[in-house]
Amino acid sequence: MGSKSKILIIGGTGYIGKFIVEASVKEGHPTFALVRETTVSDPVKGKLVEKFQNLGVSLLYGDLYDHDSLVKAIKQVDVVISTVGFMQIADQTKIIAAIKEAGNVKRFFPSEFGNDVDHVNAVEPAKSVAFAVKANIRRAVEAEGIPYTYVASNCFNGYFLPTLVQPGATTPPRDKVIIPGDGNPKAIFNKEEDIGTYTIKAVDDPRTLNKILYLRPSNNIYSFNELVALWEKKIGKTLEKIYVPEEQILKDIQEAPIPINIFLGINHSVFVKGDHTNFEIEPSFGVEASELYPEVKYTTVEEYLDQFV
């Protein structure tokens, strides 16, 4: 291994971004974060930026919507990782244009970190808003011939497990649990820190070049029924189970306002259609993170749930 790539994270103060920034530093990469001047004075994000600086992250001032600042930032690094949020996914064409102009980027990771958007059976509006928009970015990256890795990290633990995906809940269920569909399709759950670690491990790895990196650690693959059974075992109590048939879920999606209909649609794709696990990873397009990096001690779902008991 030569020297470690210099990494720029765009969207580093966001939900998954901060974990990737921290993992990059931890793995010994010269780490850069693109931040807006206004972010530094923001009461919440400003503290995060300060934390980054204390870790040794270099701040580069710029903006997704300021082409020259993007090019200038990108010219200083080898690898660009985008973790921009939901509303800015489509605007990553601006990053693609800047990477193209800069001409020095060895790898681009667009903002993915969810389902593999080329293997989804989603209904509208999630189909377009959550998935197609990311697939369009993939096609744009490929059309420009930019070297890439797409990270399909499936479910963020922090979004799904503290409530066991119960609508409107803030804690896991103690009496009854609502289960979408028949509860049998398998989904995959990963802790955010582990997503950061696996993403950074892939940066200089030739095996992940122009591939989808799937996070499918064997101990984190659960059907909804298995997840509920694990939780029942932990709390020593049997819960009343309410199964919601797919027809009802589809009706709920049609009737719910934005953005609830999008989240319901993502849940439908994951827990009813089984879009995390209903296809095999072919070597032609993908690799699996826990196989590539067996040295990573990832947090299992079982360990993660202990904090809520």
UniProtKB/Swiss-Prot annotation:
<feature type="site" description="Confers substrate specificity">
    <location>
        <position position="89"/>
    </location>
</feature>
<comment type="pathway">
    <text>Aromatic compound metabolism; phenylpropanoid biosynthesis.</text>
</comment>
<protein>
    <recommendedName>
        <fullName>Eugenol synthase 2</fullName>
        <ecNumber>1.1.1.318</ecNumber>
    </recommendedName>
</protein>
<keyword id="KW-0560">Oxidoreductase</keyword>
<keyword id="KW-0521">NADP</keyword>
<feature type="binding site">
    <location>
        <begin position="154"/>
        <end position="156"/>
    </location>
    <ligand>
        <name>NADP(+)</name>
    </ligand>
</feature>
<feature type="binding site">
    <location>
        <position position="134"/>
    </location>
    <ligand>
        <name>NADP(+)</name>
    </ligand>
</feature>
<dbReference type="Pfam" id="PF05368">
    <property type="entry name" value="NmrA"/>
</dbReference>
<keyword id="KW-0547">Nucleotide-binding</keyword>
<dbReference type="InterPro" id="IPR050608">
    <property type="entry name" value="NmrA-type/Isoflavone_red_sf"/>
</dbReference>
<dbReference type="GO" id="GO:0016491">
    <property type="term" value="F:oxidoreductase activity"/>
</dbReference>
<feature type="active site" description="Proton donor/acceptor">
    <location>
        <position position="134"/>
    </location>
</feature>
<dbReference type="InterPro" id="IPR036291">
    <property type="entry name" value="NAD(P)-bd_dom_sf"/>
</dbReference>
<feature type="site" description="Confers substrate specificity">
    <location>
        <position position="86"/>
    </location>
</feature>
<comment type="similarity">
    <text>Belongs to the NmrA-type oxidoreductase family.</text>
</comment>
<keyword id="KW-0587">Phenylpropanoid metabolism</keyword>
<feature type="binding site">
    <location>
        <begin position="86"/>
        <end position="88"/>
    </location>
    <ligand>
        <name>NADP(+)</name>
    </ligand>
</feature>
<feature type="binding site">
    <location>
        <begin position="111"/>
        <end position="113"/>
    </location>
    <ligand>
        <name>NADP(+)</name>
    </ligand>
</feature>
<feature type="site" description="Required for activity">
    <location>
        <position position="266"/>
    </location>
</feature>
<feature type="binding site">
    <location>
        <begin position="13"/>
        <end position="16"/>
    </location>
    <ligand>
        <name>NADP(+)</name>
    </ligand>
</feature>
<feature type="binding site">
    <location>
        <begin position="35"/>
        <end position="45"/>
    </location>
    <ligand>
        <name>NADP(+)</name>
    </ligand>
</feature>
<dbReference type="InterPro" id="IPR045312">
    <property type="entry name" value="PCBER-like"/>
</dbReference>
<feature type="binding site">
    <location>
        <position position="36"/>
    </location>
    <ligand>
        <name>NADP(+)</name>
    </ligand>
</feature>
<comment type="function">
    <text>Catalyzes the synthesis of the phenylpropene eugenol from coniferyl acetate. Phenylpropenes are produced by plants as defense compounds with antimicrobial and antianimal properties, or as floral attractants of pollinators.</text>
</comment>
<dbReference type="GO" id="GO:0000166">
    <property type="term" value="F:nucleotide binding"/>
</dbReference>
<dbReference type="InterPro" id="IPR008030">
    <property type="entry name" value="NmrA-like"/>
</dbReference>
<dbReference type="GO" id="GO:0009699">
    <property type="term" value="P:phenylpropanoid biosynthetic process"/>
</dbReference>
